[in-house]
């Protein structure tokens, strides 16, 4: 819940409370996040950064980070939603396949999908995707989002994105220009009422293709 303006960098940081808003408040279930203990807040949020970090170990140990007791079935379900099951299954050892420090032995898109799967295993109340689909091709992006909706139906999903197709079906879209909010609404509402958003849509796709 946003009550006053804050810049894009602050918007990304404020939900997990890496920084506090300078005015207004962010509420989770009606409670100001500044009134929550940081560790309690973090337990409710699954953060997936644009450039995620993978630890030296196995695919399974990376996915179990934060939930050590997750079963193999839970891991494969999360991998399936994240569109990562096929490439993990093709790796020698599957869940036991080795991951180099920082994930240097997998591609950028594979790192993003593994990080998304890691967050999905936690099943948090809030998912914060910080441009987490940027390394994915459009088809993979679309399949992942379609699978994410039923999987995370009990959670709030917040997506920071540059690509219109990634957020076109969101319940609410907040448009930022130079770090300032210039529009809030659904895709169709913003195409009709927000020149900045309409220009972005026109520059990326035809309105008909996205709607």
Question: How would you describe each model-predicted region?
Answer:
Residues 90, 139, 146, 150, ...:
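C-terminal portion of ABC ATPase nucleotide-binding domains
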Residues 127-130:
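Catalytic Walker B motif of ABC-type/P-loop ATPase nucleotide-binding domains
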Residues 13, 114-119, 143, 159:
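ABC ATPase nucleotide-binding domain "signature" region
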Residues 23-27, 35, 42, 60-101, ...:
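ABC ATPase nucleotide-binding domain helical subdomain, centered on the C-loop/LSGGQ "ABC signature"
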Residues 16:
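Helix-to-loop junction immediately C-terminal to a conserved catalytic motif
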Residues 150-159:
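Conserved catalytic loops of ABC-family nucleotide-binding domains
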Residues 121-125, 154:
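A short, proline-enriched helix->beta-strand linker immediately N-terminal to the Walker B motif
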């Amino acid at each position: 819940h946003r009550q006053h303006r804050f810049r894009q960098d602050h918007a990304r940081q404020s939900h997990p409370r890496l920084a506090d808003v300078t005015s207004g408040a962010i509420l989770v279930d009606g409670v100001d996040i500044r009134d929550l203990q940081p560790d309690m807040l973090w337990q409710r949020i699954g953060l997936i950064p644009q450039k995620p970090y993978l630890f030296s170990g196995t695919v399974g140990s990376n996915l179990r980070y934060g939930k050590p007791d997750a079963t193999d079935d839970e891991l494969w379900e999360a991998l399936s939603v994240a569109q990562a099951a096929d490439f993990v299954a093709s790796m020698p050892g599957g869940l036991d396949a080795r991951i180099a420090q920082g994930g240097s032995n997998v591609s950028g898109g594979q790192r993003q999908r593994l990080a998304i799967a890691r967050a999905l295993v936690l099943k948090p109340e809030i998912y914060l995707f910080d441009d987490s689909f940027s390394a994915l091709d459009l088809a993979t992006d679309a399949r992942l989002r379609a699978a994410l909706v039923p999987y995370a139906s009990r959670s709030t999903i917040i997506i920071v994105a540059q690509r219109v197709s990634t957020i076109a079906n969101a319940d609410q879209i907040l448009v930022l220009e130079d770090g300032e909010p210039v529009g809030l609404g659904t895709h169709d509402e913003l195409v009709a009422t927000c020149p900045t958003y309409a220009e972005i849509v026109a520059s990326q796709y035809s309105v008909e293709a996205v709607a």
